[in-house]
Swiss-Prot record:
Keywords, in A-Z order: Calcium, Cell adhesion, Cell membrane, Glycoprotein, Membrane, Repeat, Signal, Transmembrane, Transmembrane helix
GO cellular component terms attached to this protein's record: plasma membrane
Disulfide topology: none
Record lineage: Eukaryota, Metazoa, Chordata, Craniata, Vertebrata
Span of the signal peptide: 1-29
GO molecular function, one term: calcium ion binding
Subcellular location: Cell membrane
Annotated stretches, region: 5 X 4 AA repeats of P-X-X-P: 734-894
Record protein name field: Protocadherin alpha-1
Residues spanning the membrane: 698-718
Amino acid sequence: MVFSRRGGLGARDLLLWLLLLAAWEVGSGQLHYSIPEEAKHGTFVGRVAQDLGLELAELVPRLFRVASKTHRDLLEVDLQNGILFVNSRIDREEPCQWSAECSIHLELIADRPLQVFHVEVKVKDINDNPPVFRGREQIIFIPESRLLNSRFPIEGAADADIGANALLTYTLSPSDYFSLDVEASDELSKSLWLELRKSLDREETPELHLLLTATDGGKPELQGTVELLITVLDVNDNAPLFDQAVYRVLLLETTANGTLMTTLNASDADEGVNGEVVFSFDSGISRDIQEKFKVDSSSGEIRLIDKLDYEETKSYEIQVKAVDKGSPPMSNHCKVLVKVLDVNDNAPELAVTSLYLPIREDAPLSTVIALITVSDRDSGANGQVTCSLMPHVPFKLVSTFKNYYSLVLDSALDRESLSVYELVVTARDGGSPSLWVTARVSVEVADVNDNAPAFAQPEYTVFVKENNPPGCHIFTVSARDADAQENALVSYSLVERWVGERALSNYVSVHAESGKVYALQPLDHEEVELLQFQVSARDAGMPPLGSNVTLQVFVLDENDNAPALLAPRVGGTIGAVSELVPRLVGAGHVVAKVRAVDADSGYNAWLSYELQPAAGGARIPFRVGLYAGEISTTRVLDEADLSRYRLLVLVKDHGEPALTVTATVLVSLVESGQAPKASSRASVGVAGPEAALVDVNVYLIIAICAVSSLLVLTLLLYTALRCSVPPTEGACVPGKPTLVCSSALGSWSNSQQRRQRVCSSEGPPKTDLMAFSPGLSPSLNTSERNEQPEANLDLSGNPRQPNPDWRYSASLRAGMHSSVHLEEAGILRAGPGGPDQQWPTVSSATPEPEAGEVSPPVGAGVNSNSWTFKYGPGNPKQSGPGELPDKFIIPGSPAIISIRQEPANSQIDKSDFITFGKKEETKKKKKKKKGNKTQEKKEKGNSTTDNSDQ
């Protein structure tokens, strides 16, 4: 490092001064070098990399460079060795003119990370400019009448150098008449005078030629010369005389044009025209002075004619000449020194350089974003500039050196909150009033993948009908990513899983860009009711971020499966039933049962049975249960009936459109003691050949009659034992009876008129036993029912046996096989009833709907673990949405079912006891009912109709 040295210091003082200077440089972070002006290209200035502590290997990767705007081409750094060298000719007089000190300020910048270094290079002046006079000669007119020691001003030379190189000494060629008088003024300028040493005689010497030489103080010395041409004038021997040799004027730089600066006063002792004085600027005055000032030739007033600028010129030296009108004219000179005072008329200048944009939103704090340079052409407090940044932004200004600031990151950034910051930087000077300037810096925040795609909700529910076409669009998922560009590009994919034994990708797919979900194959409700899977959304950032959303795809059932007939319980083919019916059976006797199942669900699987009308419109003595599929007699068969009936039962579901299947049932009526030959041949929807009857084995009929007689006797004995016990209210075993009541119209009530008890003589109370009372005709009103209390009594005055009809639900019927017998399943058949009779029923896990049931079976939306009261067509009352039917019963409810604790000695009312036995007990009860019906037929001619109504 080269430092300028100052002479006159001792070794100790010099060493101390050097140490202090080095400490100041380390603290300030600025390097100082010095070079002479006019240095050649490649001249060594300093080892910048070494002095800054930078490795040579990192200069090129970090783009180490000179960033100065004004003097960038003068100096350059060699990136191979880190040396600062002269790049082009440096003329000190060009950037610094006549300044005492001349320095070149450089900014050295290194990237990754961004660093700024300041270098000050002092340019030493060399004596490369000789003194220069304005012209090659100066003409001086001197009257011959001038006295000895008279002085005549002459113009000196100017030297573009500074310091000792600009200190001029003048010498005059030898002359008998004149000598050179040099006068140093307090303005560091010299005034030259020719002093008359010998009287002039124009006639003797009209002209004199002298040579004035100016020599500077440089080494080597340089000289400049000018020829002085002295013309001796005659007569007018008194020159004008100024009252002051020097006039001093102070002007503000904002002084208006036309302002009077001063008035010169000069007098001439001569008379007449020789005493008239004319003022004018000296002929050697500069053009700049002539453009800014004007002197009145007669009055001597000097006025300002152009705007002053302190920053351009701080002072002016004006030479004014006063010339009389004599012949030859005589003149005198004075000096007007104009000092310009600074006014705060220049706003600060602000420059933003080295923008490091865009800045990543995860950039660390104190990251340098831009360099800001401020300046003010004013001086003093008017030129002191402070820089500030708009508030409430995540940035701040850090002052590095005088008039240099760095824009750095002060707090964390979030591009999703604000992607571009429009910053306003203000530079304000210290004047009064102060002036300021603003600059806008647009800081763009670069996105970082810090946001995962987000769905509007975590789960979606989709309903799709089955049998959809392949490639059907079923849903569209959409996720939003708050990032930008590729970080916000969302792609969708399935989260693979297994659905049963098949991969999820066999069922659905998702479009990677649009998020549309497609069904790849037709969905089957019977195979998959619910398809639950996840769709993943991932962005294209590095590293990628993602999130999942759950889709629940419910496959809605369509009526795409027709009812299928089940094979008979014993032998036979599907859709063909052949039955033998004795002619002695009464109304309501179950002849056969048509069984069918539907693979659909809900209403699409709810089956109903219809008996097709006979050919020719003939009436047939049979009917089929609307929902049970049981074919029963509608009246007592007689001899007038045909011996064979071919019944067509239409089974259809409740889908849209409804699908059907037809079953053929061949019913043969046989007389007692005959052995009909039975064969069943039928097909679905097509009648086959009529089955031939075969003789009935005599032994089989005898066995049946014997068993029937035994059952009748057992039932009579049992009834007699029950009737022998006197009726007692609540005569059930304490803690065991369960009371279930029903009204005559099929709605549940606690009526005293229609109350029955169901008790069990042993074992725990059975809450699943129920007693039904026969329904009355809906045409009977309350008064009619009160007037006929005996309508519910048999011939002996005892209450009639209830007629419960337990059925399997459709969901259980679908799994029944041909080998399953309804009797073996513990089903108690219904008693006789008319074709229009409808019964309120209770559906549970085991019973199936009766003909009067109008709600779908289990599997069609009804909970299979509840008992629900149903109304048939005879009782059209329907409950509104969200409410229960009147007198609705739920097993175990304390309002309907009560368990009474009777005394130990209480009697059981056996007449009210009903139980559900096995197959033999069922047959006994059937035969007993048939006997009762026969007796009633004899006593009443229309008993069949009455029993049907009951």
